[in-house]
């Protein structure tokens, strides 16, 4: 066999093989590569969007958390103010109640003192009558004597 003819035949066979591959094998491979390339590009775009969404969500969460902490601090501050107001009101009520009890006790003490004074006056009057009876050795009218003692006690 002639080497030129063999080379020519192999070149022709190779050309037919290349044409066959270009017509039947190459289009599905390029289509699959294009589809895969498109899918990878979409995946990268989705990953980029997901990162942006994640960053936005993290910013939103941190903003919401900050607002929530501020609201909690305000609520705690209001609760403390309210508690202090209740404590002050209770103290004021306790002061008023204490003053009322002290005033009542003072009034009661004053009544007892007046009652004791009246009892002492009547006892002094009785002693004065008894002393006067002994001095005069006669009985003095108790009504007249009580009037004299009342005048004397009112002057004291």
From Swiss-Prot:
GO MF annotations, alphabetized = proton-transporting ATP synthase activity, rotational mechanism; proton-transporting ATPase activity, rotational mechanism
Statement: the UniProt record of this protein carries the keyword Cell membrane: yes
Name the InterPro entries on file: ATP_synth_B-like_membr_sf, ATP_synth_b/b'su_bac/chlpt, ATP_synth_F0_bsu_bac, ATP_synthase_B_chain
Keywords in alphabetical order, please: ATP synthesis, Cell inner membrane, Cell membrane, CF(0), Hydrogen ion transport, Ion transport, Membrane, Transmembrane, Transmembrane helix, Transport
Membrane topology is: Single-pass membrane protein
Q: Where in the cell is it found?
A: Cell inner membrane
Keyword Hydrolase applies: no
Which GO CC annotations does the UniProt entry carry?
Answer: plasma membrane; proton-transporting ATP synthase complex
Q: Where are the transmembrane segments?
A: 12-32
Q: Name one Pfam family in it.
A: ATP-synt_B
Domain of life where this protein originates? Bacteria
User: What does the subunit section of this Swiss-Prot or TrEMBL entry state?
Assistant: F-type ATPases have 2 components, F(1) - the catalytic core - and F(0) - the membrane proton channel. F(1) has five subunits: alpha(3), beta(3), gamma(1), delta(1), epsilon(1). F(0) has three main subunits: a(1), b(2) and c(10-14). The alpha and beta chains form an alternating ring which encloses part of the gamma chain. F(1) is attached to F(0) by a central stalk formed by the gamma and epsilon chains, while a peripheral stalk is formed by the delta and b chains.
What the entry lists under NCBIfam families is as follows:
ATP_synt_b (TIGR01144), PRK05759.1-2 (NF004411)
Q: Which family does it belong to?
A: Belongs to the ATPase B chain family.
Give the protein's biological function: F(1)F(0) ATP synthase produces ATP from ADP in the presence of a proton or sodium gradient. F-type ATPases consist of two structural domains, F(1) containing the extramembraneous catalytic core and F(0) containing the membrane proton channel, linked together by a central stalk and a peripheral stalk. During catalysis, ATP synthesis in the catalytic domain of F(1) is coupled via a rotary mechanism of the central stalk subunits to proton translocation.
PANTHER family found in the cross-reference section = ATP SYNTHASE SUBUNIT B, ATP SYNTHASE SUBUNIT B', CHLOROPLASTIC
Write down what this protein is called: ATP synthase subunit b
What is the source species?
Stutzerimonas stutzeri (strain A1501)
Gene designation? atpF
């Amino acid at each position: 066999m002639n080497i030129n003819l063999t080379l020519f035949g192999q070149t022709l066979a190779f050309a037919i093989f290349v044409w066959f591959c270009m017509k039947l094998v190459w289009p599905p491979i390029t289509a699959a590569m294009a589809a895969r390339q498109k899918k990878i590009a979409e995946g990268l775009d989705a990953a980029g969007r997901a990162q942006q969404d994640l960053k936005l969500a993290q910013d939103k969460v941190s903003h919401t958390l900050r607002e929530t902490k501020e609201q909690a601090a305000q609520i705690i501050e209001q609760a403390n103010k309210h508690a202090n107001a209740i404590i002050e009101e209770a103290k004021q009520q306790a002061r008023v109640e204490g003053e009322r009890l002290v005033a009542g006790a003072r009034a009661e003490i004053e009544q007892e003192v007046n009652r004791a004074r009246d009892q002492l006056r009547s006892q002094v009057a009785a002693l004065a009558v008894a002393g006067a009876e002994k001095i005069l050795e006669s009985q003095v009218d108790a009504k007249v004597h009580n009037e004299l003692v009342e005048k004397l006690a009112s002057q004291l």
